[in-house]
Amino acid sequence: MIYELHVRDFSSDKSANFLLRGKFGAFCENRVTNGFSDTVGLDYIASLGVTHIHLLPVFDSQTIDENDPEAGFNWGYDPLNYNIPEGSYTTDPNNGTDRVRQFKELIHAVHQKGMGVIMDVVYNHTYSTEDSPFAKTFPEYYYRHNKDGSLSNGSACGNEFASERAMASRFIVDSLCYLAKEYKLDGFRFDLMGLLDIHTLNTAAEKLRRINPSIILYGEGWTGGKSPLPERLRAMKKNAVKLPQYAMFSDDFRDGVKGSVFEDEECGYVNGNASELSEMMKSVISGGIYRMDVQRKRSECWTDTPQQVVNYVEAHDNLTLFDKLRISMPEASGQERVSVDKLAAALVFLSQGIPFMQAGQEILRSKPSPDGGFVHDSYNSPDSVNSIKWNDVTIHRSVMEYYRGLIAIRKRFPEFRLRTAHDIRSRLEYEDLGGGALAVHYGDRLILVINPVETVLKYDPGRSAEIYADSKKADAQPLYRTKGAFAVKPHSIMLAGLN
């Protein structure tokens, strides 16, 4: 269970009593509480059942004044020096030793809570070109160019790092191995992985496994624009079979569940378009693998193993899930949107693949803009937009506890963590219930009933059952027992264990 988090967002809001706001050191603080005296911070994240914290870029970036970090904000996708921790997150940015030590202390603190640390890496481009260390070392060599000699821009950031060239490839591999070994990292997330070449990443994976056999590797299997790197060489979704040790974000899952991230008002399966997307849901619940009993083309199923799929409905990019629901469901009540949010979360945690969420998603995180709308990409928005509002842990406790319960259910039942396409095809069966509603049968042990519409759904499992999740609660221990048919409320699930 991956929890995506920006270092500064974690502790910058004054709703929690952090001492080292916006710093690596905030992760080392214990007994942090919000304005209602509820536990927040690292202890809280561990209590959710998170297994890995994915940190947005923590290497040295270019656009933040390290001696005056509050003068600006950036996610960190503006690389300067890849192998040095960002100084603005330390108590003394002018002391190189402090950068290293304080980042190591963060990682140690996370490990002490039983979680791993995944580092977001951005090898696909550098913030500047002519002034970058690579251009000064060997002009032209480290960057891709178009046929007319201009810099290519598949990153949409001004340049592309030529990973396929021998010394560029070696730099990436050496950098990853250094970071994994020196900082005891547990994984890497690759920004715009489709701009990196397959050979480099496979070489890196082989060497990284020697350092940490359980290391997690995943990324964005696409580009940000046209690139001269031939498609057959790109580390992208269509080439996933050539990258067996890497998982990739499933934009099919993301957009299928809630609607396109590029069309704010477009609805997905959970918020208004269920009947048209029920076959898509069968596919993504199965981990995106090809199934003859699901109406989806084999060419659209880009992997044959759930271990290559990262399922999510919210990340740092684009609108938060709850903001998307506000825009795409303008006539719905606040409680209806909360129900839809919980339904989307259930699909993330109870589908085959790797579940991923953005920090604060479980407390209905929102990024309102001053003009009354919502910020799509808050990469340079102020702390007032980006910070986690820790009082929401208390205000939205029921939603948070629902997420926590779903995570616990996933951990208890191996049916939600199948490892091969054969197991998925043989153990998951789908039953169409009309209007896009589905029942997912996991052998004769579990039934997951999904009701994405606005009316109550009656379902009879044919046997007595123990209910683990309904519209209000989710838990790894049975909530109650039923005999005969049960009612599944609008925009919700029922998870039943059969007796």
For each predicted feature, which ranges?
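Non-transmembrane alpha-helical segments in soluble domains
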Residues: 42-47, 107, 176-180, 205, ...
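A solvent-exposed, charged loop/short amphipathic helix patch at secondary-structure junctions
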Residues: 15-34, 324-335, 378-384
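Hydrophobic faces of well-ordered beta-strands that scaffold small-molecule active sites
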Residues: 3, 53, 117-119, 188, ...
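Substrate-binding/active-site clefts of carbohydrate-active enzymes
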Residues: 8-183, 197, 201-212, 216
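Short catalytic-loop micro-motif centered on adjacent basic/acidic residues
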Residues: 187-193
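Carbohydrate-interacting/catalytic domains
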Residues: 1-3, 8, 335-338, 349, ...
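Flexible loop/turn segments at secondary-structure boundaries
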Residues: 11-12, 61-65, 124-129, 195-199, ...
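Conserved alpha/beta catalytic core and glycan-binding cleft of carbohydrate-active enzymes
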Residues: 205-206, 210-370, 379-381, 428, ...
